[in-house]
UniProtKB/Swiss-Prot annotation:
InterPro entries: Enolase, Enolase-like_C_sf, Enolase-like_N, Enolase_C, Enolase_CS, Enolase_N. SUPFAM superfamilies: Enolase C-terminal domain-like (SSF51604), Enolase N-terminal domain-like (SSF54826). It holds the Pfam family Enolase_C. The gene is eno. Catalyzes the reversible conversion of 2-phosphoglycerate (2-PG) into phosphoenolpyruvate (PEP). It is essential for the degradation of carbohydrates via glycolysis. GO terms for biological process: glycolytic process. It is an enzyme of class 4 (lyase). It is found in: Cytoplasm; Secreted; Cell surface. This is Enolase. (2R)-2-phosphoglycerate binds at residues 163, 337, 366-367, 388.
Length: 429
């Protein structure tokens, strides 16, 4: 039977060498599941709480022993004997046990580790792939990758203000070909950067992290790389940006230190409008500060039918935040990060709410990742159509892409690649 017999957590390391939590769940049937929780660098003000120990003498205060103890001593006893396939009951029990709005008592990292491990154990018990267990027979869409090939902001030690410059191979016929496209452009970009005398060290998410003359130069350089790799910018490959504007916002202004420029909300919108007129940009994430809702309304009214406007810090995978955005006509897409909310049940609720409102959903990694590939299965399970999981570089990023290759093979002719159809709410794409 699929009844839980043991839940065990341990402290492991993420891709930045910081501690995170791994959870294992054992069942009476012998079915087993495990998961490792990711961690972010640029975090939204309203994210669920990632519980850290704060002991400066151990891992610089970033240990997660308290979260581990919460799983082993508080959560585990409550889950023993519960059917592991009852995901909603498991998640609801942990939410009630925590009792706070932001999961600040037990920690979203503790709760999420258990939530994901339970799903893996249930899928193993039923002898089906995780994407099939979570999404049923209709889970078939391979996501368009949003590949971060130039890093800046909090993800790199350079002078580039914008956190991520990405490519999206929208014209590929399959995920396999999309990944090949992205990898070839990534290698072409290295050659372009080298020819210009730029450093080709990589940032947290596997993208290159050179010092550049301006943020626009990043866009120019990527277009050069796309063409050098033999692809057509705008037709086969489009661009995307994660501005992470909350990281450059203070005193009501946006301070782009790398360029020595300070802009108002409307001036930022003006700049985005100029950039999308010059470059094939199809998506802008967190273009303004998470609390600058007036600015976001201006951004949405002016550009919402032309580009995908993704809310990350803006919505933090939270249905209350998303509902407010939908009601006010703010943005047209939500970034989905499982550790922003803390359970799979709440994650899926956010995705469903977005779809019902005509918003797109982009499944995302965090800058601190591991070998865990759960988000790849979630992307297919929900038919989200888009996944953001870094450059085709660094094992913690490539692991997700390789899992999607496996899933595409398993689905055989039944799988569909998202491509340009992933942007179903854009009038001009």
């Amino acid at each position: 039977m699929p009844y839980i017999t043991d839940v065990y957590a341990r402290e492991v390391l993420d891709s930045r060498g910081n501690p995170t939590i791994e959870v294992e769940i054992f069942t009476e049937s012998g079915a087993f599941g495990s998961a490792i929780v990711p961690s972010g660098a640029s975090t939204g003000e309203y994210e669920a709480v990632e519980l850290r120990d704060g002991d400066k003498d151990r891992y610089l205060g970033k240990g997660v022993q308290k979260a581990v103890e919460n799983v082993n001593d508080l959560i585990a006893p409550e889950l023993i004997g519960i059917d592991v396939t009852r995901q909603n009951i498991i998640d609801a029990l942990m939410i009630d046990l925590d009792g706070t709005e932001n999961k600040g008592k037990l920690g979203a990292n503790a709760i999420l580790g258990v939530s994901m491990a339970a799903a893996h154990a249930a899928a193993n018990y039923l002898e089906v792939p995780l994407y099939n267990y979570l999404g049923g027979f209709n889970a078939k869409t391979l996501p368009t990758p949003m590949m971060n090939i130039l890093n800046g902001g909090e993800h790199a030690d350079n002078n580039v203000d914008i956190q991520e410059f990405m490519i999206m191979p929208v014209g590929a016929p399959t995920f396999k070909e999309a990944l090949r496209t992205g990898a070839e452009i990534f290698h072409a970009l290295k050659k372009v950067l080298t020819s210009k005398g730029y450093n080709t060290a990589v940032g947290d998410e596997g993208g290159f992290a050179p010092n550049l003359g301006s943020n626009e130069e990043a866009l120019q350089t990527i277009v050069e790389a796309i063409e050098a790799a033999g692809y057509k910018p705008g037709e086969e490959v489009k661009l995307a940006m994660d501005v992470a504007a909350s990281e450059i916002y203070s005193d009501g202004k946006y301070n782009l230190k790398g360029e020595g420029v300070v802009r108002s909300s409307e001036e930022m919108v003006d700049w985005y409008e100029e950039m999308i007129s010059k470059y094939p940009i199809i998506s802008i994430e967190d273009g303004l500060d998470e609390n600058d809702w007036d600015g976001f309304k201006i951004l949405t009214d002016r550009l919402g039918d032309k580009v995908q406007l993704v809310g990350d810090d803006l919505f933090v995978t939270n249905t209350n935040k998303l509902s407010k955005g939908i009601d006010q006509g703010i943005g047209n897409s939500i970034l989905i990060k499982v550790n922003q909310i803390g359970t799979l049940t709440e994650t899926f609720e956010a995705i469903e709410m977005a779809k019902r409102a005509g918003y797109t959903a982009v499944i995302s990694h965090r800058s601190g990742e591991t070998e865990d590939v759960t988000i790849a299965d979630i992307a297919v399970a929900t038919n989200a159509g888009q996944i953001k999981t870094g450059a085709p570089s660094r094992t913690d990023r490539v692991a997700k892409y390789n899992q999607l290759l496996r899933i595409e093979d398993e689905l055989a002719g039944m799988g569909e690649y998202g491509g340009l159809a992933s942007f179903y709410n854009l009038a001009n794409k």
